Amino acid sequence: MSSLTPLLLRSLTGPARRLMVPRAQVHSKPPREQLGVLDITIGLTSCFVCCLLPAGWVLSHLESYKKRE
């Protein structure tokens, strides 16, 4: 059985290797206005508060979730 596995996998992936996948030609323009330091700071802080703060709170209170009351 184990000697047939590579042959089976090769026969399944063989046709997929020959497919040509077209690549998109994506071009963008330069930004209309440059972001300042304050804008970047506000954006990174809001991402931190929205994503990492709740996860950190849950991880810090993990022991209280494990207790059965």
Curated annotation (Swiss-Prot):
This is Cytochrome c oxidase subunit 8A, mitochondrial. It comes from Rattus norvegicus (Rat). The gene is Cox8a. Keywords: Membrane, Mitochondrion, Mitochondrion inner membrane, Transit peptide, Transmembrane, Transmembrane helix, Ubl conjugation. Component of the cytochrome c oxidase, the last enzyme in the mitochondrial electron transport chain which drives oxidative phosphorylation. The respiratory chain contains 3 multisubunit complexes succinate dehydrogenase (complex II, CII), ubiquinol-cytochrome c oxidoreductase (cytochrome b-c1 complex, complex III, CIII) and cytochrome c oxidase (complex IV, CIV), that cooperate to transfer electrons derived from NADH and succinate to molecular oxygen, creating an electrochemical gradient over the inner membrane that drives transmembrane transport and the ATP synthase. Belongs to the cytochrome c oxidase VIII family. It is found in: Mitochondrion inner membrane. It is a single-pass membrane protein. PANTHER family: CYTOCHROME C OXIDASE POLYPEPTIDE VIII (PTHR16717), CYTOCHROME C OXIDASE SUBUNIT 8A, MITOCHONDRIAL (PTHR16717:SF1).
